A protein has these predicted regions:
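Polar, enzyme-active/binding microenvironments
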Residues: 5, 9, 13-15, 53, ...
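Short glycine/threonine/proline-enriched tight-turn/helix- or strand-capping micro-motif at secondary-structure
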Residues: 11-49
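Residue "hotspots" at secondary-structure boundaries inside conserved domains
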Residues: 41-43, 101, 107
Length: 210
């Protein structure tokens, strides 16, 4: 599988999450792909058919005015692609329904860069965390097929391989740090706690006097 917007496995969970899906007698048309990151919630700038691409963040916001159709996207990021990188008509990529944004308008981004965190803000159908990925030729144009950027086909299923980690419990390393200041010690403790080392009893700290 080509690199997409998530690291590891991804899923198209429902039929209505596919690009081009219609319902309501053809009155409602889905202009993007609803992609779930199974191994990571971090939304990243994708590749195009394994090719690295670059662009500029033009919008990173949430619209609350319901007269503006984009309120349905919730928190979203728009990236304008640099010119002449791909042979298709896509110039803008939208990453929608985010829980948290990691970029600001004006930021330069490239394939693999962190853009946002997957969520279900706005009018996210189904009540599950995902990213609505939309591709457009113009900022206000109709959605184009985003599958070459998605990292998976435009079909229901699970795609990709689970990312391997270096967390081999048979290979443990003893690390001694210090002496350090109280601020540095607190930072080390916070990191160890986030990695689960404190709860596992693998973190030890001693204060010296004098």
């Amino acid at each position: 599988m080509m690199p997409g917007i998530f690291t590891g496995r991804v899923q198209i969970k429902y039929r209505y999450g596919r690009y081009g899906y219609t319902r309501g007698g053809g009155k409602i048309w889905h202009g993007g792909m609803d992609i779930v990151g199974l191994d990571s919630t971090d939304i990243r700038m994708p590749h195009y058919k394994n090719k690295r691409i670059t662009g500029t963040v033009t919008r990173a916001r949430r619209v609350t005015d319901h007269s503006n159709k984009t309120w349905e996207w919730g928190w979203y990021v728009c990236v304008k692609l640099d010119a002449s990188q791909t042979p298709d008509d896509v110039n803008f990529l939208y990453f929608c329904h985010c829980r948290e944004l990691k970029v600001q308008p004006g930021d330069r981004v490239a394939s693999g860069d962190l853009l946002a965190v997957m969520g279900q803000s706005g009018n996210a159908a189904g009540g599950y965390d995902h990213c609505h990925l939309e591709a457009r030729a113009t900022a206000n144009g109709k959605g184009l097929d985003p599958s070459q950027y998605a990292g998976c086909p435009n079909a229901v299923g699970v795609y990709g391989e689970q990312q391997k980690t270096n967390d081999d419990p048979t290979k443990m390393q003893l690390i001694t740090v210090g002496p350090v200041s109280r601020g540095d010690a607190d930072a080390v403790y916070t990191l160890c706690r986030s990695r689960g080392l404190v709860d596992a009893g693998l973190y030890k700290s001693e204060w010296s006097v004098g």
